[in-house]
Amino acid sequence: MINLTKNKINNTNLFYVIIITIFSFFINFYYSSLGSFPIDTFLHYDSSSRILNGELPVRDFWVVSGLTVDFIQAFFFKIFGVNWYAYVIHSSLFNCLISLIVYFFFLEIKLGKLKALILSLSFATLSYTISGTPFVDLHATFLLLIPTLL
């Protein structure tokens, strides 16, 4: 279990956390806007905006995947408005979260700060950027990985 009091957030760790946060957010934010896959990229966009308009999945419209990502995205649409940037902020923040958890996990197993940084940045590059937008398979994988690492 990751214990942040044991892994004191000193200046080096704080600097690495800032690097990981900025890198993991912006690498996903950048690559998510390079192109789209009509079948996958907009899978949760429409259903999330419909939830925001008061409709409920299954009762009012058909969904092809789980409901978790739709409701999380509806929350982001509520905060940032229904637009592409709100859609991408969701996946970019999720990339930050999982990358930081991976970093602290590597510190917990005493991998070393620099190695943990490099591996966490590598993880951030590969984790959510393959889709760029909220995607049910990636959310499911990472929501299972988070408690495993914690």
Give names to the regions the model predicted:
Residues 1-9:
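Short, Lys/Arg-rich, polar N-terminal cytosolic tail immediately upstream
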Residues 10-39:
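Transmembrane signal-anchor helices characteristic of membrane glycosylation enzymes that use polyprenol
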Residues 12, 82-86, 90, 112-118:
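Membrane-interface starts of transmembrane alpha-helices
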Residues 32-47, 57-75, 82-85:
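Extracytoplasmic catalytic/substrate-binding loops of multi-pass membrane glycan-assembly enzymes
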Residues 67, 80-100:
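Loop-to-helix entry region of an early transmembrane alpha helix in multi-pass inner-membrane enzymes
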Residues 73, 87-94, 136, 148:
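Alpha-helical transmembrane segments of multi-pass integral membrane proteins
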Residues 102-125, 141-142, 146:
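Transmembrane-helix signature of polytopic, membrane-embedded enzymes
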Residues 132-140:
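Short acidic/glycine- and proline-prone juxtamembrane loop motifs at membrane-interface regions
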